[in-house]
Swiss-Prot record:
SMART domains named in the record: G_patch
Reactions mediated catalytically: a 5'-end (N(7)-methyl 5'-triphosphoguanosine)-ribonucleoside in mRNA + S-adenosyl-L-methionine = a 5'-end (N(7)-methyl 5'-triphosphoguanosine)-(2'-O-methyl-ribonucleoside) in mRNA + S-adenosyl-L-homocysteine + H(+)
Gene from which the chain derives: Cmtr1
Domain RrmJ-type SAM-dependent 2'-O-MTase: 171-384
Organism (species): Drosophila melanogaster
Name listed for the protein in its UniProt record: Cap-specific mRNA (nucleoside-2'-O-)-methyltransferase 1
Signal peptide region: none
Disulfide bonds, paired cysteine numbers: none
UniProt binding sites for substrate: K143, T144, V145, F146, D147, R158, N308, I309, Q310, N373
Amino acid sequence: MDEPSDDENSEPTPKKIKREWVKSYSNKAMEMMKKMGYENDKGLGKSNQGRLEPIIAVQQDGRRGFGLKLDTVQSSAGQWDPACEELEIPEPVLWLHNPGSRADAYSLDQLMGHLVTGEKKLTLDGETRYCDPAILHHILNAKTVFDDLNDNEKRRARSRCNPFETIRSSIFLNRAAVKMANIDSMCNFMFTNPRDPAGQTLVAPDELLYFTDMCAGPGGFSEYVLYRKSWEAKGFGFTLRGANDFKLEKFFAASPESFDTFYGVKEDGNIFDESNQDSLNEYIRMHTPQGVHFAMADGGFSVEGQKNIQEILSKQLYLCQFLTALKILRPNGSFVCKVFDLFTPFSVGLVYLMYKCFQQIAIIKPNSSRPANSERYLVCKYKRSDAETAGIVAYLNTVNLMLSDESQLDENDVLEIFNANELAEDEDFLRYIIDSNNAIGKKQIVGLRKIAAFAQNLELKETKQSEVRQECLKRWGLPDKLRQAPENKPTDRLLDELLADWANERSWLSLPATEMKGVASLNATIKNVADWYFVPVGREETNINACSLFLCKSRGNLLRYTEHKKWELVETAFEVQPRSIFFGQIVYEFYGEGRTIQRMAALHIIDGICLGGVDIRRRPYRERVSMCDKFARSLNKPYRKDRTFGALRSKPLFRLQDMGSFFANMRHYVLKDNSQRLGFALDDNKFFVPGGIMMFCELTNNYVSAHSRSRGQLYYFNVRNKESYYKDQIPRNKADEIFASFRFSFSCRLLWKWTDLRQVEELATEDNPKILFRSDFVKFIADKLGHS
């Protein structure tokens, strides 16, 4: 990749040449020289003439020998004029809109007529249809000059001359993450905050932001997205196994629990394999049937010694990344992909087909991408429907098979995939490609010449690096600080942070639920059935299965608050994001029935205080439960083959007034000992056996909800001062007074425990004031609703 591309993400810091030469000598040496007549700032000659500093020793680099003469282009470049370089912050983004024919205008048969094969090309010479010939000539010449420089020289010169160099990887594991932050900012955060053409969000309130990161090890793009969105996003990673795999343990700026790696049906992460592409699509659709909101691709490989034909060598990689994106994206989805030179008819034809599959495209060069390389990014916005893009997907599949069949392409190659003459008829597209290539090419020539100048003249220095760093980080929404590993704080200190103003008085943490043992206890506690909700809870066979508070301190470090008021490590492995504290229960979920039944531990979340650092304690009860559900869906990986963690899900929530339908949906399951128990079916062919229900009120003691007949709206009524507020007109300062916080809901929770199998039978009853039967509870609810 031209002057190593952006898989330059972890580079050694170059050694500095000593400038303050005086410090290189001991005080004794300087004193001896002064005794012999030496004076500061005067030469050593008889008349104080001569050099004022020592001759610097030869800086030997690598295997370079004495007497080497660098190319005249480089030598002349030793003089650098800063006016040659134009900095644009922010960078302009020029969108190309596609108002013309749609993707479904092309069938597979029609597109096959565009295919051109011929003798394999191993040079870009003559590829001037889509750029100014002079620019291509200067780019290729400028790159060739660097063959005379070794890696250390190039690296040192690049570090000194690039105005954006000191941004480096910021708080992330590599520079790719910073590039994604830069691109997201350039494009008005269209990836982490996607909106439709009318400006409305494309992510529903209870929906996760789904994304895919392809050919992306070690994962910088994903680290940025998770830094920005945390667990409100869920990512799918696809890359080659091996040395360039994802390094999730190196995610310091974000937690990787919401990231799910998948390597295809072949288990190798090879994106050239059609079966891998299709299995990735199937895996994603199991989680989100519509597809992902956006896809990112950052593929590249070493082209050492063949930098000038990187585009030709990367053609199948381009195609497969584009093709996979079309398969996995939902309608209105977006795509960003790293590409290099776009001079050949093959590459331009690929971009044209993507242009037809989306409403808008842009080719951008972010400032975080070094100016001297040919790297750029294709950004595609608002994907058209799968039905519209089906013909192009089938065509790209066919071309990929041809490229993969080495026997067919031993000497020949696919040279064009869309007729160049027909493409040229789309004047807007043609002009866009030419202008883009020329603009990026001019900047690249300037960048290459600047590196050559700085390599030749060690006195040159870029003075804007500090100023540019601060401005860019601010614009991209990144902190100006160094990367550091997350701190593993002591339990009490972390609790102080997460509980905040609830930390001083913690007695409520150990408050038990109030048990309902008869209709009298229901009458004493439940004023308005409409304000109450319930979740089914497990049987609590042991203390470990009791409903408890859970605290995740760090990755793999989940604690449970015991009845002894101590935090103990949970032995079962669950993948929970650090800085989380919530109320939940470890239950056994079952798969199958009878003697073949299998059971596995699962963690069910009931309510939350803080989820992955997001404070939800004072949000209304239903909103907290909805966020707990999103949190669990983001972290859970139900379809992984190598499941090393227990399942994570939120408890199913029901309105108390819907208890009848809750029981109607339960059925009897046969357990391993041939006993039959009422079980609750989960959404993945599993079930669990409840041992009771736990109830929560969404309002504080002073309020009840009611329905206004005159306005047809819900309102909240204060039973003490008789004030009332419609749901959509609640003052901000009243919300905390009306809606129960986590602490209030937790402290006032009720428990109906099923200690007798007859309690949950539909018609069973008994005149026992200490046992609450289902029939009595259902009648209580009906009576309450009848009186409201």
